[in-house]
Amino acid sequence: MKLAIVIINWNGIKLLKKFLMPLITHNNNENEIYVIDNNSSDDSIDYIKTNFPKIKIIENPKNYGYAKGYNEGIKKINADILCLLNNDVQVTKNWITPIMDEFKVNSTTAAIQPK
């Protein structure tokens, strides 16, 4: 099963600087990471391109907001599982394991979220 980690962003360079490195550190290299950018006017996109060239960037032509921003961006992602994260989420070691385990064990699972 292919999992894509997807982050929505709008002018979030300060948060990206704080939370992207732990995300990459605690990601196995099988999962692609995407940032859907809602037409940021800060240096978010340049920061990602310069410091994290493996992260895929999807640029929305305008700020669609949270839900529509995700909806527009995920149309361009090919994965079995979409893990939607805010840009201020700090992940920990093995955080992906229970997500993948649930989808592998229960074929009827459509969505999960933490407590």
Residue ranges: model-predicted function:
Residues 22, 37-45, 62:
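A conserved acidic beta->alpha catalytic loop
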Residues 30-39, 58-60:
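Short beta-strand/loop segment that forms part of the nucleotide-sugar
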